[in-house]
Swiss-Prot record:
Coiled coil: none annotated. It is an enzyme of class 2 (transferase). The keyword Thylakoid does not apply. It comes from Anaeromyxobacter sp. (strain K). This is Ribosomal RNA large subunit methyltransferase H. S-adenosyl-L-methionine binds at L71, G102. GO terms for cellular component: cytoplasm. Transmembrane segments: none annotated. InterPro entries: Alpha/beta_knot_MTases, RlmH-like, tRNA_m1G_MTases_N.
Length: 153
């Protein structure tokens, strides 16, 4: 199984990228993992236009048979153990998974319509680059839970 995090924008601040890269490297021991960053839309067209442009770019990165899971504030809130079980089910299906993270204005309706699942990483509103770090860390945590390794206590 391959898991891809497809996210709008780059971490220009440098705050989160090193940690995301570290967890991505660790994930490589368990599964094929890829982080795909797509550019943020210019806000000249307004919020709706920018969301639409980013949405089209995200959808273009998805394979026809990939399971699409979006991060959305109205998505399922899971514990780490429940998320690990979700990952286990994805692995049992043998289907590649694309986890999509929108930009600062959220996801376009077309992206939400394409989603097979919606997940929320927190009830808090998080910067989308911080949400990316939380998601990648939780993927790593899920793999250690499934393997019975001591990372998750």
């Amino acid at each position: 199984m391959k898991v891809r995090v497809v996210a709008v924008g780059r971490d220009r601040s440098g705050l989160y990228a090193p940690a995301v890269e570290e967890y991505a490297k660790r994930l490589g021991r368990y599964l094929r993992f890829e982080l795909v960053e797509v550019p943020e839309a210019r806000k000249l067209a307004g919020t709706a236009g920018a969301k639409g442009e980013e949405g089209a770019t995200l959808l273009a990165k998805i394979g026809p048979r990939e399971r699409v899971v979006v991060l959305d504030e109205r998505g399922d809130e899971l514990t780490s153990v429940a998320f690990a079980e979700r990952v286990r089910r994805w692995m049992e299906r043998g289907q590649d998974v694309a986890l999509l993270i929108g930009g600062s204005d959220g996801l376009a309706p077309e992206v939400l319509a394409r989603a097979d699942e919606r997940l929320a990483v927190s009830r808090f509103t998080l910067a989308h680059r911080l949400a990316r770090l939380v998601l990648v860390e939780q993927l790593y945590r899920a793999m250690t839970i499934l393997r019975g390794e001591p990372y998750h206590k």
